[in-house]
């Protein structure tokens, strides 16, 4: 196989993976679970220090299996019931009795959560104490990327390179572009990419869950009621928005089902998957073509997001939906040029959407960007595109660089302001 394609598959396997619950509080649960394996006994006290961005994305979202919100319950649950071997599915087997144990620790004032100053966007340091014993685990640069382990002050493990880059480093040193992703998705042997179909299965189950039960703001179920009442129609646009939002409703509402995430985000994994799957159903394409489209969507999203920090004031659903729109054009039989038009159109439409933390209303943002993806792919098929206007360049690669520049140079103060507003 082409060595470059092997690198692309490695990237996908590394950052497109199942995640149970919003990944920021789950990072704390995972760190606690790893620390518990070091400590060897149930902790009497837990201390959690996190970056501002991780704090922001943990303030308003339910931790799966607990029915509760926030970093304190995530860390306590991880220490009591977490499976350190399960990664982002660390809390998959938690029981109501264990949730009660975790809550007892919190009620006794034994769980302390603090923000800490750090240059890292993803940072979580958990310390567990029991008597004279103490275990520390530090996560840095990625939701399950362990930088350091200590037992009673003595180093047990230190990563060779604990510091993450200021921007997503997943694509650093790799020859990758929208054109190469498009070619890879079209030409790579099907058996090498079949694994991506798991995204359709997992995120489809979340969508079904969100439609069946009243999670969060019930964005998906509200649209279903509107269809039943004859207020809106059940066309492709509304079906995509409804079912994509429903999956996010369930995820943000603490459903005990994993999402297939994209670069650490379950919602963005949903946005990269469900619109593509529903478009494939509409056009009645083969399973192989669906897999190729999902590869295009997920890897395209990863590539665009590698141009800016993993957590920021920018809502990543925008560029994820841009990649999904590119894949939707491919499914519909459009050209590479038209796929680029779709990316340009979505970014032009939705690039002003900010991230003000993970919470129930994320389902609305997912629905907004997914709606833009549908409009944009239809416009692209008609060869209508935004070009040379605002931050949208005449070339898609330049537009992607412009997004990175806007976020890195223009939105750092926005992020600080958002966190300040949320913390007062």
Curated annotation (Swiss-Prot):
Extract the GO molecular function terms from the UniProt entry.
L-cysteine desulfhydrase activity
- What's a BP term from Gene Ontology annotated to this protein? L-cysteine catabolic process to pyruvate
Signal peptide (residue range)? none
Give the family per the record. Belongs to the UPF0597 family.
Name the PANTHER family on file. UPF0597 PROTEIN YHAM
Protein name (database record): UPF0597 protein Sputcn32_1209
**Taxonomy of the source species:** Bacteria, Pseudomonadati, Pseudomonadota, Gammaproteobacteria, Alteromonadales
